[in-house]
């Protein structure tokens, strides 16, 4: 019996692979992933005028009401198709493409979709709008025509045969083929009951997403995210909200003798299992829709106490009532006045401290090194009076006099004190992601603390005015501004104690922090004012401050800082920084530190370079 079962499973597995391979319309050997094309696609999209703040994300295959062949119905394939869409905020491309038998054609299809999206506008009529965008793109860039022709020719060979289509479907198929071959040549398309075979070269209407979760949902999602990391794709799913069944209001609506029959098909209020399904993540990958419960309790839930603000007796010490700051809403294209409350704070329990022992040797070397760069006295040549004779000027004067010149000589060298004309504000991102471990002993926050301490030691020896601050946030009403050292405060044990008392915070409302830093730095009298930002990720917060909204607000804050004559510069350890920091700070406005442990050393190297 066991052998028969194993044989049946073996035959079934081989039959499944055989039938799906012959019925599938994809070519696995030529599959190309979006992740491998993400950077060049972003460059293409922005080079042709696409908004820099638009996110490039993966989207799952979409279920379409297609007319499938008998073999496809038997195999259960071709129910979903990889389609692309663009809604102005994000460009959604398939997680992978295998629609062509050649990998290069699949890469070319990715490039075409990115270029088409850069030319796209609001989608009102699927076929007419895609024709218009394609025609505009090909007219503006004739060099694209051969590439587009290759994609169309390869796709037309894969479309259903006209002989196998009903009359109405065949009429639509002819119109689509003509529209693909000659964009703009077809104005009217016949109506049919089923969707036409997918057109991977066109953009489809965007998905209708359910409203974002409430604030409470956001906290629970953030708390649950830290429990366990499951390997999964980057594609987003469509979602719908459902009401969770309440196990406390069960009502017996059936007779017990029917328990195993029709009762199983009734929409009864049954309680759910409290344990997490170990196969849930795998099953979710195969679903088109995810049903999201409004139930506040979690299955197998754990607590993330660090996501909630601590009690006042244990929280950091607030300094004053807080400051109201504006925030940029890119949808309305205006600043929302007094939208954010920034609370200055100091770490609780911070006491005067000396430099940690593991930094003493490095600090001594840096103090000596930066002391050599300390501003001293500058020598001015050809002065009418001074401390010593300028020999070069005297020789020039003698030559001119013998030639008959009568230039009034400036024969002296004068030494004057060199004015320090640079002020620097160092702003550190203290979000919860800094709690991540670099190795078995050190965290990201430890590297940031070392960077702040060594930066203070070096600039104290150099003599440049500087200030140290940190920030994190919990929604717009709680942007926590850690005051470590003001410009008018000396660097010493008190400042070291505050830095050593730092701990990972919450989220990253970067725009508000940059605006406050610009206010502080803008009040300094120095001609050159440098704003350095230490960061480890994108701007994000609980209340819609993520994605393009957070990116655009941060960019606007950087623009405001530059308009005040400040020089903002970001130093990051985020390996994906190249995807968004050029838009925020410019191509030369940021530096990536590959290893977080090298942050202290690289910070001071960059400061020396920027100081010149």
Swiss-Prot record:
> Which SMART domains does the entry link to?
VWA (SM00327)
Which CDD domains does the record associate with it?
Answer: vWA_norD_type (cd01454)
Q: What is its main location?
A: cytoplasm
Record Pfam families: VWA
Query: Which Gene Ontology cellular component annotation is one that this UniProt entry carries?
Result: cytoplasm
> Which positions fall inside the VWFA domain?
421-610
Q: Where in the cell is it found?
A: Cytoplasm
Q: Which keywords, in A-to-Z order, does the entry hold?
A: Cytoplasm
| Chain segments carrying region Disordered | 213-238
List the InterPro entries. Answer: NorD/CobT, VWF_A, vWFA_dom_sf
Q: According to its UniProt entry, what is the function of this protein?
A: Component of the anaerobic respiratory chain that transforms nitrate to dinitrogen (denitrification). Function unknown, but essential for the denitrification process.
What is the recorded name of this protein?
Uncharacterized protein PA0525
| Species, as recorded | Pseudomonas aeruginosa (strain ATCC 15692 / DSM 22644 / CIP 104116 / JCM 14847 / LMG 12228 / 1C / PRS 101 / PAO1)
Q: Source organism lineage?
A: Bacteria, Pseudomonadati, Pseudomonadota, Gammaproteobacteria, Pseudomonadales
């Amino acid at each position: 019996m066991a052998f028969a079962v194993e044989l049946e499973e073996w035959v079934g597995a081989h039959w499944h692979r055989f039938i799906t391979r012959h019925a599938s319309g994809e070519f696995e050997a030529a599959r190309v992933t979006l992740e491998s094309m993400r950077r060049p696609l972003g460059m293409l999209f922005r080079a042709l005028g696409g908004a820099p703040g638009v996110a490039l994300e993966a989207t799952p295959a979409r279920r379409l009401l297609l007319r499938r062949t008998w073999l496809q119905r038997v195999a259960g394939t071709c129910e979903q198709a990889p389609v692309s869409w663009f809604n102005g905020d994000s460009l959604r491309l398939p997680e992978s493409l295998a629609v062509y038998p050649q990998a290069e054609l699949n890469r070319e299809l990715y490039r075409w979709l990115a270029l088409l999206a850069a030319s796209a506008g609001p989608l009102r009529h699927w076929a007419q709008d895609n024709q218009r965008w394609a025609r505009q793109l090909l007219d503006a860039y004739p060099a694209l025509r051969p590439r587009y022709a290759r994609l169309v020719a390869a796709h037309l060979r894969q479309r259903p045969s006209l002989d196998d289509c009903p009359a109405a479907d065949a009429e639509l198929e002819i119109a689509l083929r003509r529209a693909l071959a000659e964009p703009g040549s077809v104005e009217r398309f016949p109506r049919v009951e089923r969707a036409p075979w997918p057109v991977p070269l066109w953009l489809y209407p965007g998905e209708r997403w359910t409203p974002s979760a409430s604030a409470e949902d956001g906290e629970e999602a953030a708390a649950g995210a830290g429990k366990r990391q499951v390997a999964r794709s980057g594609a987003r799913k469509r979602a719908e909200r459902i009401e969770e069944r309440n196990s406390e209001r069960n009502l017996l609506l059936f007779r017990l003798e029917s328990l195993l029959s029709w009762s199983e098909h009734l929409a009864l209020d049954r309680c759910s299992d409290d344990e997490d399904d170990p196969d849930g993540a795998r099953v979710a990958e195969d679903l088109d829709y995810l049903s999201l419960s409004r139930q506040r309790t979690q299955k197998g839930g754990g607590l993330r106490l660090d996501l909630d603000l601590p009690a006042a007796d244990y929280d950091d010490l607030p300094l004053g009532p807080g400051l109201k700051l504006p925030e940029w809403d890119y949808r309305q294209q205006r600043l929302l006045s007094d939208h954010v409350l920034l609370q200055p704070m100091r770490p609780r329990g911070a006491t005067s401290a000396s430099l940690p022992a593991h930094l003493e040797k490095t600090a001594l070397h840096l103090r000596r090194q930066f002391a050599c760069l300390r501003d001293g006295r500058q020598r001015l040549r050809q002065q009418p009076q001074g401390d010593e004779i300028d020999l070069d000027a005297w020789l020039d004067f003698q030559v001119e006099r013998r030639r008959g010149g009568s230039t009034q000589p400036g024969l002296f060298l004068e030494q004057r004190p060199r004015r320090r004309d640079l002020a620097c504000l160092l702003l550190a991102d203290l979000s919860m992601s800094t709690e991540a471990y670099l190795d078995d002993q050190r965290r990201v926050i430890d590297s940031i603390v070392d960077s702040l301490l060594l930066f203070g030691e070096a600039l104290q020896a150099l003599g440049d005015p500087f200030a140290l601050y940190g920030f994190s946030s919990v929604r717009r009403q709680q942007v926590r501004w850690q005051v470590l050292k003001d410009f008018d405060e000396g660097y010493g044990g008190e400042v070291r104690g505050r830095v050593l008392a730092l701990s990972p915070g919450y989220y990253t409302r970067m725009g508000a922090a940059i605006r406050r830093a610009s206010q502080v730095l803008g009040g300094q009298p120095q001609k050159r004012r440098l704003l350095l930002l230490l960061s480890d990720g994108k701007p994000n917060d609980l209340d819609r401050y993520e994605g393009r909204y957070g990116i655009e607000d941060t960019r606007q804050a950087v623009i405001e800082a530059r308009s005040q004559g400040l020089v903002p510069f970001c130093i990051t350890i985020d390996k994906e920084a190249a995807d968004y920091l050029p838009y925020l700070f410019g191509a030369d406005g940021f530096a990536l530190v590959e290893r977080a442990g090298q942050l202290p050393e690289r910070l001071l190297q960059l400061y020396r370079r920027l100081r010149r």
